[in-house]
Each structure stands twice: as C-alpha cells, then as structure tokens.
Amino acid sequence: MFRQTLRLGTRMRHSPKFLGTSQMVEQFPSIAARKYSNHPSSSFNNDGGPKVRHFLFVGLVGTMLFVLVVNKINEQDPKTSLAKKKNTYSEQEWESYVAGLKRKKQRFDSSSNKEFYAVPFANKNPKQIENLKRKVSKSSSQEDVGVVDINELIAKQMNNSESAYGLLLKTTLVENDPSSQSCTYSFNWNLAKGIFSKLVCDELTRMINESPQLDRFLLLNFPNNLPEAIKFEQDVANITELIVFNEEQKEDVVVKYFDTVDKVSISK
C-alpha cells in the first residue's frame, strides 16, 4: 500500500499540471517583489500638497483686504474724520462744529429767549387759562403771550382740504370726545410720532412771524402723549413749565415725565 502511494506521488510530481503549478508558486515571490520595488510615479512626487507660496499669497491678499476695510471704517468714524478736518477750522469754529454734532438743533433754543408753558388739561378750564395768561405775561395787556390749542390745530387741519396733514389725521382718527379734559382727539398707532409737535411748531413760527412781540406761549391740551412730549423737547423747544389744576392730574404719565425734572406746578 505504501509503495503504491509513493509511486502515485512520483507520477503526480512529474505530471504537466503539477509542474505548471509549482512554477507559478516559485515565480510569485519575484513578481511581488518587483511590484513593490517599483519607484513612485512622477505624478505622486509632484503632488507635494499645498506649497508655502500658496499660503503666502492667501495671507498677502487677506492682509490687503483687512487694511482696506479698516481704512474705510476710519473714514466713516466721526472722531477720526473730524480730526482730519480740524486743520481747516479755527478753534472757535471747531468747538461750535463739535457742539452742533452733539445735539440736534431745536427750532427755538435758549438763545430765542422764549418761554413755553404746557397745559395738558386745558379743555374744560377757560377761566384758569385767562389766569395763566396774566400770570406768565410781563405786560398788563398780555400782548406778549400767545396761545396754541392742539384741539383747534387738529380741527383746522382736518377741515382743510388742502392741508398736508388733514387726510392723514382723518384716516387715523379713532375718536373725538368733546368731554375730554385734554386733547379730545385720539388716533391709532399708524399716525407717525411727532406730527403734533410739527403742527405746534409750524403754528408757533407763524405767530412769531406775524407778531414778533410774542415771547410767552401757552400750549393747551399739549403734549397729548409721552412720545410727543419727548419729540417736542428734542426738535422744537424746552418746556419751561407744565401746569396742572389739581393733584389727580399729576398721575398722568406725561405729567410724571416732567415731574422728574421738577417742571410741574399746580395752578388754582
């Protein structure tokens, strides 16, 4: 049995199929060695990743853009731009210019020498208004006192078909309550803030142009809300004094606003 197996193995070793297989096994190591011993291709060598010059170029462009942006911001900076202009100003002109930038110009500032007395609850107090005119006037004839009633201004605008504000007031009007102690008109939120201050300012300007002796003004039923009070003092003039007729009226938000700066007084 052993001899037969040995002879069978000998015949298989000398068979063509076995010889082909053994030759392939012997050749495989040399083929694999040649495969892994080849040098990298030239394209791999050339692809060295981002070059240093690329980073330098990006950095240079970024720096240039940054400098341009900073210079643009400096040109728009009031402190920087004004400093450049100072060489063309005299010292007095420069101080005046800066002061003008710090605050918005009022239509009637302190240099106008005019006084403005706000009376937000004047609608039902005609006798008190006459007393106030005598109180604030420097003349026995009271010819230096002008009276502006916001209720009358609104009605005048709404009844004037050519008014620049009439249509706007009509379309935003919510209610007209004649029994109100203050401004009888109320409007919705679409009405732009400051329109009543503009109406009062225009009326004051007209009155002063027609009667230059006027330098005391009673503003009746005005300011009619807090935004108008703030807008009036920003754009038109400072309120000299706000006058009410009883303690209950001091609870109004507009009155409280002026009370914080001690401008509220009670007139009996």
Curated annotation (Swiss-Prot):
Membrane topology, record value: Single-pass membrane protein
Source taxon at top rank: Eukaryota
Keyword Mitochondrion applies: yes
Transit peptide interval: 1-36
Compartments in which it is found: Mitochondrion membrane
Record GO cellular component, one term: mitochondrial membrane
Transmembrane segments: 54-70
Keywords: Membrane, Mitochondrion, Transit peptide, Transmembrane, Transmembrane helix
Family: Belongs to the AIM36 family.
Protein name stated in the entry: Altered inheritance of mitochondria protein 36, mitochondrial
Source organism per UniProt: Komagataella phaffii (strain GS115 / ATCC 20864) (Yeast)
